[in-house]
A protein has these predicted regions:
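Classical nucleotidyltransferase
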Residues: 1-22
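A short glycine-rich, His/Asp/Glu-containing loop-to-beta-strand
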Residues: 18-57, 63, 115
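A generic "binding-loop/recognition-motif" signal
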Residues: 46, 55-56, 66, 97-98, ...
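Short beta-strand His + acidic residue motifs that chelate non-heme Fe in jelly-roll/DSBH
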Residues: 49-51, 69-70, 92-93, 99-106, ...
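Short glycine/proline-enriched turns and hinge-like loops at secondary-structure junctions
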Residues: 52-54, 62, 85, 104-106
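A compact, surface-exposed functional segment
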Residues: 58-59, 63-65, 71, 128
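Double-stranded beta-helix
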Residues: 100-130
Length: 130
């Protein structure tokens, strides 16, 4: 129908996509500088970088697909697999905690709702692990 054919335009206008090598994200809501809600879409077989944030924590809610999450043991510096999180499961990432989001599926996109909160929610608050 005509109404449905242009619905993507409204969605794109309200929350434009920011493309990344792993997929894309949309900022859904920013009520103040200390809180931001994003939707991450990770393409099949793709992985975000191992990263941490100094000034914010994150809460991840898996909306669709299966997420695999890795972290770094700060005592041993070994990478640890926190396991898989299926749709409707959630995970808390503390500030300064190394974390990596992976979509191991070769056919289904992973959608995660990310709630960022802390002193600041700026995109440049990121340190990537070599």
């Amino acid at each position: 129908t005509k109404a449905n054919s242009s619905s993507w335009i409204l969605e794109e206008w309200k929350a434009p996509r920011t493309e990344r090598a792993w997929g894309f994200y949309r900022v859904l809501h920013t009520p103040n500088p200390r809180v931001k809600v994003k939707e991450l879409t990770v393409n099949p077989g793709c992985t975000l970088s191992m990263q941490r944030h100094r000034y914010r924590s994150e809460h991840w809610f898996v909306a669709e697909g299966v997420a695999r999450v890795l972290t770094v043991n700060m005592a041993s510096t070994d990478v640890e697999d926190l396991g898989q999180y299926i749709a409707h499961q959630a995970l808390h990432i503390r500030d300064n905690q190394w974390h990596q989001l992976c979509n191991d599926s070769q056919s289904q996109a992973l959608r995660v709702i990310e709630i960022q909160y802390g002193e600041a929610t700026e995109e440049d608050d990121i340190e990537r692990r070599a």
